Amino acid sequence: MNASHPELKWLEDPRVFAVNRLDAHSDHTWYTEAGDLRQSLDGAWRFAYSASPAARPADFWQPDASLDGFDEIAVPGHIEMQGYGQIQYINTMYPWDGRHALRPPHIAWDDTPVGSYVKTFTLDQALQGKRVCVSFQGVERAFYCWCNGHFVGYSEDSFTPADFDLTAFLQEGENRLCVEVYKNCSGSWLEDQDFFRFFGIFRSVYLYAKPALHIEDLWLQAGLEPDNTTGTLAPRLRLSAAEGASLEGCTLHCTVAAPGGAVLWDAPMPLRADGSGYVYGLPVRLPGIRKWDHSDPALYTVTLTLRDAAGAVQETVPYQTGFRRFGLRDGVMELNGERIIFNGVNRHEWNPASGRAIGPEDMYRAMETFRRNNINAVRTCHYPDQTLWYELCDQNGIYMIDEANLESHGSWQKMSAVEPSWNVPGSLPEWRDCVVDRARSMFERDKNHTAILIWSCGNESYAGEDILAMSDFFHQNDPGRLVHYEGVFHCRAFDQISDIESRMYAKPDEIRAYLESRPAKPFILCEYMHDMGNSLGGMESYIRLLEYPQYQGGFVWDYMDQALWQAGVRGRRLGYGGDFGERPTDYAFSANGIVFADGEEKPAMQDLRYWYDTPARRAAHDARNAKEAAAFRLPALRAGGPLTVIEGDVNLGVEGDGFALQFSYAEGGLASLRKAGGPEWVWRAPRPALWRAATENDKGCGFPVRSAAWMAADAFPKAEGWQVEEKSSQQVRIRYTFSFPTVPGASADLTYTVTGSALRVDAVYHGVPGAPELPVFGVRMSTLHPAARVCWTGLSGETYPDRYKGASFGRWAETPHIPAYLVPQDCGVHMDTRTLTLEQQDAACRTTAALTVRMADDTPFAFSALPNTAQELESAAHRDELPRTGRTVLTIMGAVRGVGGIDSWGTDVEPACRICGEEDHSVSFIVEL
């Protein structure tokens, strides 16, 4: 659509989404003898924030308009992240839910913030005298643009470029570019992604000049013949000429260089036209190439040089491409003739200091994490990313699902129910051009990237004729890639939209049933293993599905926690939904990453790295662990002397060679443990451990409600009595019995056996018919003084019954700490432990006291050593709300509930990783004295 004057009514008209905007084009760069023809407009802009359109400075775009009262703002950057408006995180609901009664395509005119931007610039010498355009790489959500008082254009779609021709509006010397950004428009109904809601110019802005003859659009169309050694190149170009110039007689020269620099092709490329507006280069066959894939992402540099009829070079375009072949055969996706497996993640663009306005360093770091952890695929959820990310995926062999900027789940998912009565875009004709334009804009920009194997029509937008039109666009324009859309699962009438059967969070048994039904389509999980908090348990059940050829992997949800730095109780902390005073919100549901918001890997990453490795390397890892564990031998306990028993009215004292213990009848257990004149180790007598702080997955499946009795039991056990079962100079054994305030009532015994050099502890839980599942069973003790270090022999990192295979067996050490889960929850468990040692240290980090615990009866145990109790973790909403106790809470466990990972809103952990309250459970260990 073209227009010479702007109209506010466009904001509510889904048929108006681009006014005077240039056609979308490939992301290629070009240069001339004068060098690069780009000029960045990033940096400081003048800025005014208005709470509504009525309050905006309506004439700020006039060339002589005063900017008094305007501030400065950084571009790129979100407006909310620079002190204006309201930061808001929300998942499914629309941001205005409960504040404004709206239906598509309308907006709340009195609650639509506006950002007014002004940038003055002088054209660089290299751009002067040429056709000059401006490119906005990303603006949320809708914007109008003026140059030197002239209306330039209007655009929606926050995540693809919007280019406008400025040539007719530029003047010598200083120029004034004005941009008016609106937070809400009809397009807002299509951008209901599960993320923080921002607006503003959040990606780069730059000017670019076109030579007299210019390659407007380029599609290399690189391919691979079935021999996997012969590459093909069939460029398609769209050319333009400046006023007074002519394309008549122009020529194109093509050079192809191998990764090492060797030139494989260097010759003129004849062009032909077919009346479509494109010209086509004569196809080229290149024998002896290396096929592109994850293991060898070989990229070849194609250089196209455009000359005019006189032979003068007009511009040179370099582009890196790989040669590969992708498609379906017998219902299986194949890359270069071999079945492909996606070991993928979903990735939002995110930085905790700047939101989605990320920089190159964020992308480089993410790519390093991908390569280090065997991640070979990424889905750009749920919008196209910055161009640099695609280049990095090309270079590193990361397979891509490139997803269009479309998500409207708030229009058909209400309180988790499917209710599409006013779903957009659906089959509404007034929305069709808008969503197809989003598909086209993504396709045209990204089509040359070798890494992209699949186009996605968007996310969670139900289905209908409009999304079918998107799919048809991809199929008609790019037969060399597949089309993905998960939403047809909810509306099978439009099953033809997707070439792939794609699901979210389907359970392994459901997938198995599909795979055994002789399906026509291959299966992927576009989202699975919801890594909210302490999660990612049970991944093995999905990996085992790879035995079915049509199961081709999935994409973990998701890569990085979405959280923002804010002022907290003790300084800077990461805030989540609701922390910024916004309502409505979905609180911490934004924290689902396999890395924390600061980019550090979560403890679960070692398991993802293991399961995303090759079967051969997993087998080698398992064999290495088995060998190391089998070779481990407990050292013999030292020879101990006779025991001295001191019988008091309230305490039973036991002293031996280098140690002294006290067992309290009143306290109900071990009240004191000292070694060789060292410090006191026991703060309060150990108790049966019956509760862990609920994980996000526990909460989601209702486990804390079903098993809440154990929280009270853990906090308020009753020592019913004691019995001294043996008392001699060789051995002392005392048993304590505990009852718990549960219905039905339950009990446990804690037995201490002292010998000349050791204290053995045996804990037994007595199962009761009708008792709910336990989260844990073991023994918990707090030290009087904090341990500076805990060392253990067993599995590395944080492990659970359903998340331990990626750990390595060995000797490990760490400072007792709470991992950086956004919301405190159970953490720090170490499975399959043989020994552990708590160390106290002086200021020089020298060990001053140590307490060692070893397994009993050759039976390993699990343990955690944390600075906080389960109750303290349960009560805190942020890590900085945890009290500084000055103690270490040591929990030794014989039974541990898994963490789960299928989803965080209803699915329980796998049955094998639950703890039945009707059965007996026990744990035994030995404390060296």
Q: What are these language model-derived features?
A:
Residues 168-174, 238-327:
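Extended acidic/polar, glycine-enriched regions
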